[in-house]
UniProtKB/Swiss-Prot annotation:
Protein name as it appears in the record: Solute carrier family 7 member 12
Top-level taxonomic group: Eukaryota
Family of this protein: Belongs to the amino acid-polyamine-organocation (APC) superfamily.
Gene Ontology MF terms: amino acid transmembrane transporter activity
Length: 465
């Protein structure tokens, strides 16, 4: 039994949109405009430039996914290029980043929905956590039903997101194309230019809004014709996202003044309240809709990383066993349980900021591994080969995203992030020394196979074919 290659170009594109289009477009424009010194052309240029940088980085990852078209390809690739310890470190980072991030997103969805019924006062904690748990476990069930079910859900989610952004983009042209709106752009070039430090901060803010394309590398083993589908989807998909982000920002600037954007907690909600004041209540549901797809993609991504690590012997074999729907059900359940703990003990969700540095470190390690294998194994079949300067550009971008916050505003949090990374190496040493003595997992695996009706999957080398 193996994971099914069931995703074509359409469903892969929908998953990419679902993972990439998030609530960042509702919040980030405020910070970008602020760091751009209220200079509209500079602000829009940063959004466009970061879109191009995102395509560059995504195409580098596409070479990894097409050379090793497996689920959890990033882990498999790092282990073979930089060694087991580095691969385990990436696993350590993703483990915490996924379950803390998923828990935080579920809580945010629940808070947005329940807040509609408690206007003027904060939403109560107990109903919020109960709804968050219900949402989380519902997505866990969807993930366990197989990649086809996940794809159809993300298709619906993507259509909602694309419809909302198209509505925001086109409303200015159809409804609010008045002289007073257009006049705000007439003197845009007269604003002062930001300094290099401010531009760096703005780029850092926008970069978070383009995260999500790595989901295709994680599910490469379930994509039909990955050598053609992945590069094509990344180029067209991120280009569409970039255009939508630009049009949405122009719409914000046409309806709201720069000062209104700067002082808004959520630019998207403020825009909605200004343009459609009679349906203000729908804003919270739209924010929730933008997060639903991210939660679904997060669970799938995390379970595939568990699956790959299990096949490589880092985790017990139970995590790589598949159910009747060709899904690693135990890995799905494990992620949902860990995320449930994060929701119940909501205070630990704030730890997610300590693993943010690790996400950029993983991308840096992948680029170094890609560069290394280019020179050590130049004859490996590469269905898609990215232009070499793109790899160096991605390395420079990762270094920029890692060190800019440390240089601009050093804090104790950065020390905690480094300690977190070193803890990963400590856990690797413990895992390497205790793995051979943990015979109790064999008995547990047998019982779990009967309980969940799961069976072992094929060797990763066989799945590449």
């Amino acid at each position: 039994m193996q994971l099914l290659r069931a995703l074509g170009v359409f469903h892969v594109s929908m998953i990419l949109f679902s993972a990439t289009l998030g609530t960042g477009i509702f919040v980030t424009p405020k910070a970008v405009l602020k760091y751009s010194s209220l200079n509209i052309p500079v602000s829009l240029s940063i959004w466009a430039g970061c879109g191009l940088l995102s395509i560059m980085s995504a195409l580098c990852n596409a070479e990894i996914a097409t050379t090793y078209p497996l689920s959890g390809a990033s882990y498999y690739f790092l282990k073979r290029t930089l060694g087991s310890s580095v691969a385990f470190l990436s696993l350590w980072i993703k483990l915490f980043a996924h379950f803390l991030g998923i828990g935080a997103q579920c809580l945010l969805i629940a808070t947005s929905v329940i807040q509609c019924f408690y206007s003027g006062c904060p939403a109560p904690e107990l109903p919020t956590k109960c709804l968050a748990l219900a949402i989380l476990w519902s997505f866990g069930i969807v993930s366990a039903r197989g990649i086809k079910t996940v794809a159809w859900f993300n298709t619906v989610s993507s259509f909602i997101k694309l419809s909302v952004l198209c509505l925001i983009s086109l409303t200015v042209l159809l409804v609010n194309g008045k002289k007073e709106n257009v006049s705000r752009f007439e003197n845009a070039l007269d604003a002062e230019l930001p300094n290099a430090s401010q531009i760096a901060d703005a780029i850092l803010q926008v970069s978070y809004s383009y995260l999500g394309s790595s989901v295709l590398i994680v599910i490469a083993g379930e994509i039909k014709r990955p050598t053609e589908t992945i590069p094509k989807t990344l180029i067209y998909g991120i280009s569409i996202v970039t255009v939508l982000y630009l049009l949405t920002n122009i719409s914000y600037l046409a309806v709201l003044t720069s000062q209104e954007i700067i002082f808004s907690d959520s630019v998207g909600v403020t825009w909605m309240n200004r343009v459609f004041p009679s349906i203000q209540w729908i804003s919270s549901f739209l924010i929730s809709a933008f997060l639903l797809g991210s939660v679904s993609c997060g669970i799938v991504s995390a379970s595939r990383v568990f699956y790959s690590a299990s096949q490589e012997g880092e985790f017990p074999s139970i995590y790589s066993m598949l159910n009747d729907h060709h899904s690693p059900a135990v890995a799905d359940i494990q992620i949902v349980i860990l995320s449930s703990v994060a929701i119940i003990s909501s205070s630990i969700i704030y730890l997610v900021k300590y693993v943010s540095l690790g996400s950029f470190c993983i991308n840096l390690l992948q680029m170094i591994g890609l560069l290394k294998i280019r020179y050590q194994n130049p004859d490996i079949p590469r269905p898609y080969k990215v232009w070499l300067p793109f790899i160096f550009g991605s390395i420079a971008l990762s270094l920029f995203l890692i060190f800019t916050p440390v240089i601009q505003s050093p804090s104790i949090e950065h020390v905690y992030q480094v300690v977190f990374l070193f803890c990963g190496f400590l856990c690797y040493w413990l895992q390497a020394n205790l793995n051979g003595h943990a015979t109790c997992f064999d008995t547990i695996t047998c019982y779990c196979q009967l309980l969940f009706n799961i069976s072992p999957s094929e060797d990763p080398e066989e799945q590449k074919n």
